[in-house]
Amino acid sequence: MSDLNPSRAVTCYQMEKLARAIEAFRNSENAYSKEIPAQVIATFLYVASHDDCNKIDMERELELSSASGSRNTDWLSDQHRLGKPGLGLIVKYRDRTNRRRQILQLTAKGRQLANTMKQILYGEQTI
């Protein structure tokens, strides 16, 4: 690296890659995605790594309340709270065998973002 400013020199390339992957998430189309909470990113990463998971399992694994899980998945779906547009990264639908259970699945846009993040972190794609 030829940067002459030592405060800007990368000292850990793995963490720098992680920062770029998170920045890819924050650079979504919605203006308010810049201020996205870590819980929402964690929820997205859980769904990306457990596609077709149920919401209760996600909440249990991430130690979220049902209300937090709903807020996070609303933010990631097409419709955010109070009529605001969501990020459109996941869809929620009812389980056919248990109507009380919600299933979470990546949209094409969500798969594309997950692939971008994997490419940044590992140089690989395809979800």
Model-identified regions with their sequence ranges:
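N-terminal helix-turn-helix DNA-binding core of bacterial DNA-binding proteins
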Residues: N27-S65
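Residues in the recognition helix of alpha-helical DNA-binding motifs
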Residues: N72
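Extended hydrophobic secondary-structure segments that form protein cores and membrane-embedded regions
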Residues: F44, I90-R94, Q105
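Basic, amphipathic "hinge/linker" alpha-helix immediately C-terminal to the N-terminal HTH DNA-binding motif
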Residues: R96-A114
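A short, conserved structural fragment
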Residues: S77-R94
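N-terminal leader segment of winged-helix/HTH proteins
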Residues: M1-A38
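Amphipathic alpha-helical dimerization/coiled-coil segments
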Residues: N5-P6, A24-S28, R111-I127
